[in-house]
């Protein structure tokens, strides 16, 4: 079953809570969840959407980055996964504005994230995931020589295939969710 741990909210008037109080509460809750999971008492935790301004965005962009910092992950290999038994979705970039995504992706980042994802599936589900990687541009930038699909994404996929990852792509992001993709466990987008 689902175990719920209450983190007491000690505000006299919860409708007049200051930003500072809310921030302390959110960080306390996330830290408690992290500590419990780090002690192998639980396999993971679920969080609801959090106002990113409460995490001191100068240092931490979101929960994914908060957990990476707590786990001393400095190589940007952490993965945010939205998961259910039928399909998981993973963005390569997290908490980055759309106009910065193209400049934020690179071959090494894609490789790091997908190796982490693959290892996670092997550890948690005892199997190799079938991974679909999406392109960045509409229609995959028509796979033109200067597109991110040709310069960055495809070389990363080819390198991962050499490492024996079960991976396909880049597929067109425009239409990937129109039909049911039962042949994939995970769809990986650039954002």
Label for each model-derived stretch:
Residues 1-191:
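Anion-binding alpha/beta catalytic cores of soluble intermediary-metabolism enzymes, centered on
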